Amino acid sequence: MLLGVNIDHVATLRQARGTRYPDPVKAALDAEEAGADGITVHLREDRRHIQERDVLLLKDVLQTRMNFEMGVTEEMMLFAEKIRPAHICLVPETRQELTTEGGLDVAGQEARIKAAVERLSRTGAEVSLFIDADERQIEASRRVGAPAIELHTGRYADAETPTDVAEELKRIVDGVAFGVGQGLIVNAGHGLHYHNVEAVAAIKGINELNIGHALVAHALFVGFKAAVAEMKALIVAASR
């Protein structure tokens, strides 16, 4: 199973003071050295963390691949066509949210998402859709032509009781199986950390987990390379 390292919150720390440090590009290179299979960045409309310059630098220096998360806007479509990343993940986005709060409603806007997928696919990127583990959304993702999906694991991560955790984990398991059955590449992520990742990593059929905030937080105490290496080891062991 692959590990995609999201470096958004390295940039969050930088933007909090408007400084030049810490550098998310350095974090990305350290993550690659520690075993990351790819680097994920989300250029938000409000530019609260990652900036255009970060993305342009990463495109030039990454040894693995970039997974570019973006809202479905004309501004971001034009930017993605300019940088031509290896992977593009379409996500929902609102200015008020602290972080992405749910999956993209593909079923409710199929024509719009289909047009975006077709346009972005012409750049050569593998386009994925960040969605909830819901059969209706998974089927819609296939219909619009996306080759991949990323299942939102936030509800699992936020579950507090054993019953709720088990229920949300089953939702992910079922979603993965359904997605694979639809012929889709299935990734997953959001809210995963060192104490909840193993159950998700053990799910057969998941191609990649995208993890960020927990890695950045742990890196404050152990360093970024060690934080990434530790997460990678957990995922590899659980997915055997």
Swiss-Prot record:
Primary enzyme class: transferase
E.C. number: 2.6.99.2
Signal peptide stretch: none
Keyword DNA damage appears in the UniProt entry: no
Entry GO terms, CC: cytosol
Active site: 42 (proton acceptor), 69 (proton acceptor), 190 (proton donor)
Catalytic activity: 3-amino-2-oxopropyl phosphate + 1-deoxy-D-xylulose 5-phosphate = pyridoxine 5'-phosphate + phosphate + 2 H2O + H(+)
Assembly description: Homooctamer; tetramer of dimers.
Protein name in the entry: Pyridoxine 5'-phosphate synthase
Organism: Pseudomonas entomophila (strain L48)
